[in-house]
């Protein structure tokens, strides 16, 4: 999304409600979808309009007064409205005209939904072979249960309860496995818990989500170490993760990327305490675990970024004998991390990087030699090395 429509950290309740309605909840109503999916979306729209934004059947009548205000004209009708009524009218005005026409009936109706009780499954929810949409929505529902518990705990302010109500309104849609909505909602659910969970219980509240992400990423690197196994065919690279697992990894990357971007936004707004909480949460997921999972999902550039972040975070103090400027650190990587870099550079066709990596260690593996020879166009030599690697692998299996 561009800057005008992005889901940023500082959206008000009215702005976030409008974007959820426009971008997600209106789709079932505009399409040919029927049954529980439409009912769930309609109920969520009703809850957002009536219970979060305070819209009523009379709200559309105040739209002309809002338009007068936008033209910088004096409006007695606008001045007579309360602050809550003005926020409701502004939210209503922010909706597209087609959307306003479609959701108008929900301002004067009172639909009901059966609140089905779902068990709070233990973490991690991710299991090998799980469907992506099912896993993502169950994760969002797990977070909603914690937000609901925090809201009902008695210590929440009026503003916190209002935001919690917003995040809980779409629960019926998650029961219909709306993965796109769940993916957009999870960062906001985590943000709410990070900012408002009591310090003494924050770790226990957020630990299941960290465990969830680690479970996905750990499974992504299980099927055989990509950098250690011979390529399946020339140029094929390492074995790709399964489609569902790759989607789960991409969702994890999206959540961490979003929270990282929000950390920067909060720093710019001088909200340093909130930014520190976000940073601590995102840094709890090991960078090298992210890098290995990214490489197996085919995201070589992302893998390189994670390795570079890891190198920056673990840079050692500079010994006196190294001729570096004050404040600089010499970055040294273990052999397994250099091997991952080698595999990633091979994916993005960066032959010059192989020269630099070669200077970081005295020997390379046969698999890495195959990769370098392929990039140099020396295919006969690459085939010979590949055959040698296969023979060594067969010998180890026989031994």
Segments from the language model and where they lie:
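Eukaryotic intrinsically disordered, low-complexity segments enriched for acidic and Ser/Thr/Pro residues
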Residues: 1-399
